[in-house]
C-alpha cells in the first residue's frame, strides 16, 4: 500500500532536515516547507538522490496568514499521512524589553500557523480516520512559566495544551488518528543562535532527537520527551511550590543569556 505525503514545516535546518531524512528513509514522499529556497532545493536534491523518493518544495513564510492559507491550498489535493509542525523560534529578554514585532511574529509562527495547519490536517485525515500529527513544542511547554523568555514559554505551553486536549478528544471518539507533541530540552540547532541563548547543559543532537521522536510517534506516545534528565526535571518540578519553581526557572534563564537582564 502506497504511503501518503509527510509535510514538514521548518524543513530547511536543524530538526526539520533530520525529520526529512528519517521519513525519506522510511519511504514517505515529502513536502518540505520553509522560507529559505536555496536550502530547501539542496535538501530536496539530496533526499531524492539518496532515497529515491518524491520530494516537493514549498517556499512559504508561515508567520504570514496569507502564506499559511496558500500553503494549505497547495496541500489540499495531496494524500496527507503525516504533518510535522516543526517551524518555530524563541527570543530571550525581559518581557518589557523584547521587541513587540518579534513577540507577535513568534506568536504567529509558534501558535497561529501551527493551529491552522493542525486543524487543516486533522479535518483532512478524519475522512479516512488515519494519519499522524506531531507538533514540535519544547520542555518549556511542560513548565508553568519562563521568566526572561516569557513569550516563547507561553507559546509552547499553548502547543502542549492544545495537543493533549485534541489527543483526548480523538481517543474518546475512538479515532485512529495520532496527535502528539515533542518536548525536548536543549538540542544542537540554530535555534540557540536565533534566540541568543547558551544552555548550561549540553544539547542532544538534532538527528537523535528527530529519530527518537519519529519512533515514539509511530508508537503513539502522546508527549515525547527525549532525555531522562528532562523527564526527571519536569517530574520533580511538579512537587515544588509554584512560585519557587518559577524562581528556579528564572535563575536558569538568566544563566543562559549571561545575566544580561
Where are these regions (language model features)?
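Residue(s) in the substrate-gating loop at a strand-loop-helix junction
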Residues: 138
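Conserved NAD(P)H cofactor-binding loop of Rossmann-fold oxidoreductase domains
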Residues: 86-91
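Conserved glycine-rich Rossmann-like NAD(P)H-binding loop of the short-chain dehydrogenase/reductase
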Residues: 26-42
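Conserved glycine-rich cofactor-binding loop
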Residues: 12-13
